Design a protein with these regions (language model features):
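Soluble catalytic domains of membrane acyltransferases
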Residues: 59-132
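A transmembrane-helix-recognition feature enriched in membrane-embedded lipid enzymes
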Residues: 2-66, 114-115
């Protein structure tokens, strides 16, 4: 019975995760459309939506985030890191308003690529000298 419950719980979390991604994808599309696709008007709202999305994903996936040290809140800054897994993106994105830099290939990924585009991700083509 426990194995069946664990399987059901994992499938339930996966379903919630997919629903959450679709909800934020549609929300981003609506916001971009309402403001006529003008990035200067939607950048703050988009960053806030991306942060809320990351926090909700962490909660659904059972990820607990603990901050230690001298955390200064939402100040401007530039964070450079080499993440170990895709969960790192959720954790970092849920802590502060962020705009991510990503490889250009991510843009073509279904669902997550679309979310990255809506979140104003900066895409870098690492195959060209100009892009890298």
């Amino acid at each position: 019975m426990t194995a069946l419950y664990n399987l059901f719980f994992k499938l339930y979390r996966l379903f919630l995760f997919l629903c959450l991604n679709i909800f934020f994808l549609l929300s981003g599309l609506i916001i971009k459309t309402l403001f006529f696709l003008r990035e200067e008007k939607t950048a703050g709202t988009t960053a806030l939506l991306a942060m809320l999305w990351a926090q909700a994903c962490c909660r659904i996936l059972g990820i607990r985030v603990t901050l230690s040290g001298n955390y200064q809140g939402f100040k401007l800054g530039f964070i450079v890191c080499n993440h170990i897994s895709y969960l790192d993106i959720l954790v970092m994105g849920g802590i502060r308003l962020s705009i991510f830099v990503s490889k250009i290939e991510v843009k073509k990924w279904p669902l997550l690529g679309w979310l990255a585009v809506l979140a104003n991700t900066i895409f870098i083509d690492r195959k060209t000298k100009k892009g890298a």
